A protein has these predicted regions:
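Alpha-helical, largely C-terminal catalytic domains
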Residues: 1-166
């Protein structure tokens, strides 16, 4: 019965993610109440950041910020699916998702937009296509996070890290 409940919730979450990833404010009516405030806050914050970047740098960063957040939410959904289905991913499966779920790529995009004196589409493309060192630096972040994760998080049912995948 619990598995059936989770599968129903999973399909609802996937539907919610579909609406949220369209980045359409009109889609907010399709979201459940608990997600409306979260989506509105994220939507407004990202629009404000993109507007400021366009005004100050002449570059539209919206698509890059949106992609980062959609990728992050999808990776969280993968981890949720593993957890609720009792699936123990292989180390490769875990790491293929974990370097995104640690939020490294989205932090790098936001850092670049906030700190860079000259924003270029080429650099944004490089950051959001996860080329070069992005996966590696995010993997280091994930490993450090998993190594330093306090035991109390593991005791409250926190999702597995690579050490209990092995």
């Amino acid at each position: 019965m619990a598995k059936l409940d989770f599968n129903m919730l999973q399909s609802i979450y996937q539907e919610d993610l579909k609406y949220a990833s369209r980045w359409d404010i009109a889609a907010i009516d399709q979201l459940p109440e608990y997600m409306k405030q979260c989506f509105l806050t994220l939507y407004n914050a990202i629009n404000e950041i993109a507007s400021e970047a366009l005004t100050n740098h002449g570059v539209d960063v919206m698509q890059y910020l949106k992609k980062g957040w959609v990728d992050l939410c999808k990776s969280y959904l993968v981890e949720s699916n593993w957890y609720h289905n009792g699936y123990k991913p292989t180390m490769q499966e875990y790491m293929n998702n974990a370097w995104i779920s640690v939020a490294g790529p989205i932090m790098l995009v936001h850092s670049y937009v906030f700190v860079s004196s000259q924003i270029t589409k080429e650099e944004l493309e490089r950051l959001t296509t996860h080329a070069d060192t992005i996966p590696w630096s995010s993997t280091i972040m994930r490993l450090a996070n998993d190594i330093l994760k306090p035991l109390d998080e593991q005791n409250i049912g926190e999702f597995q890290n690579q050490f209990n995948v092995i």
